[in-house]
């Protein structure tokens, strides 16, 4: 069992993402003291069952930062931004800093959500923060279930210390609400891979054209 904290600006799709996993949605518990919903998400691996207790902020990040109680004992994290809203990516370093102040040296995945939406404001090649901080990055679409399992698989491998760990069955997910243009998305991911071989920009503020 691992405590997974999910952070990012309001409206980036954190709750939608967590709620895709149906058993977690069915068994969630509300913790009024810190205003969070805790969803137990189960994944079945070749090494047995892994349960992530996903802490979802219940929207209180809209009132400024989150209390330390939200982060304490966090063993892994997902930082989410919305590829259709530039500001949510610009705020990623702040979320990362707040997280690392309380949780040192935990595995973190950066997720760019809503890649099913046509008009991206944050291009794949502009996403460089994960390279500076040595985080894993995935492009996801919560509403279409695209890449849903990837962040969990990465974190499970890190936490288990086993790069060969794999899921032996898919979790029960809510049916997709939207379809994703896979050809266009593969193009974005190719750009991402290409950008990964380029030197990082010098400035801290990620360049937007």
Curated annotation (Swiss-Prot):
Residues 187-209 are annotated as: Disordered. It is found in: Nucleus. Residues 187-196 have a biased composition (Low complexity). Transmembrane segments: none annotated. GTP binds at residues 9-16, 59, 113-116, 141-143. CDD domains: Ran (cd00877). Its main location: nucleus. Residues 28-36 are annotated as: Switch-I. InterPro entries: P-loop_NTPase, Ran_GTPase, Small_GTP-bd, Small_GTPase. Gene3D superfamilies: P-loop containing nucleotide triphosphate hydrolases. It comes from the Eukaryota. Keywords: GTP-binding, Nucleotide-binding, Nucleus, Protein transport, Transport. GO terms for cellular component: cytoplasm; nucleus. GO terms for molecular function: GTP binding; GTPase activity. One of its GO terms (biological process) is protein import into nucleus. Residues 59-75 are annotated as: Switch-II. Residues 1-162 form the Small GTPase Ran-type domain. The keyword Cytoplasm does not apply. Belongs to the small GTPase superfamily. Ran family. GTP-binding protein involved in nucleocytoplasmic transport. Required for the import of protein into the nucleus and also for RNA export. Involved in chromatin condensation and control of cell cycle. PANTHER family: GTP-BINDING NUCLEAR PROTEIN RAN-1, RAN GTPASE. Found in a nuclear export complex with RanGTP, exportin and pre-miRNA. This is GTP-binding nuclear protein Ran1A. It comes from Lotus japonicus.
């Amino acid at each position: 069992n691992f405590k997974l904290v999910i952070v990012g600006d309001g409206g980036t799709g954190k709750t939608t993402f967590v709620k895709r996993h149906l058993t977690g949605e069915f068994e969630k518990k509300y913790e009024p003291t810190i205003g969070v919903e805790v969803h137990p998400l189960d994944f079945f691996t070749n090494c047995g069952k892994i349960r992530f207790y996903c802490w979802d902020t219940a929207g209180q990040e809209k009132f400024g930062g989150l209390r330390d109680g939200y982060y304490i004992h966090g063993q892994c994290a997902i930082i989410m931004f919305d590829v259709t809203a530039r500001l949510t990516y610009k705020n990623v370093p702040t979320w990362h800093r707040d997280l690392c102040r309380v949780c040192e040296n935990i595995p973190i995945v950066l997720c760019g959500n809503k890649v099913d939406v046509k008009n991206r404001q944050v291009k794949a090649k502009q996403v460089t923060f994960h390279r500076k901080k040595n985080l894993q990055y995935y492009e996801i679409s919560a509403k279409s279930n695209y890449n849903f399992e990837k962040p969990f698989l990465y974190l499970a491998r890190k936490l288990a210390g086993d790069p060969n760990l794999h899921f032996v069955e898919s979790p029960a997910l809510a049916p997709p609400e939207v379809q994703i243009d896979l050809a266009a998305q593969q193009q974005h991911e190719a750009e991402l891979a290409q950008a990964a071989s380029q030197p990082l920009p010098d400035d801290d503020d990620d360049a937007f054209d």
